[in-house]
């Protein structure tokens, strides 16, 4: 159950449809993330269901939603403007490019609009060329009102975030982003055994989906696994540090 202290990482749980969300479970996480893996790596929910969840739980947890696997500049901006009217706390969008010019064009164009909702760029660590140009151009995000990046995996197979990006590299990335006043989240088939190590890196948020599912395809949520994960995540931080050093 949540016992978060200020400046500690937040727990994000991804839900694939409205049937998975129970009012009794809000106490186990900080951010309710609406993402349908059946529709893509960052597949989007239907608008009516997003609005329903926002109405139900906005006063109890924060709500984020993904816009879908849309990677064209025009498509992303259109979806960001649409989702900005939903009352969300965060809107997550991805980018899939090897071009610095395309990255800068997208981010600069986003910066011309005023969004009420916090924008979160999903950075796919298994797409090395995209990750590299983002890391080399961090200054453009803060300048254009994007203060949140989340490291994730695009391909949802047996590999996870740490398979592609070890904790030392993650810490270095978080430090670079901190200098630019950008918050970093971590996700990508993470499991309970990753919690201690990743919390010590002090990300803004750590996200889970696979870890709370009863099947390998991430289709069926297990409430028992959710409770176990929450207990692991919100256990005393000093105990986590002690365990890491043991």
Predicted features along the sequence, with ranges:
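N-terminal entry module detector
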Residues: 1-41
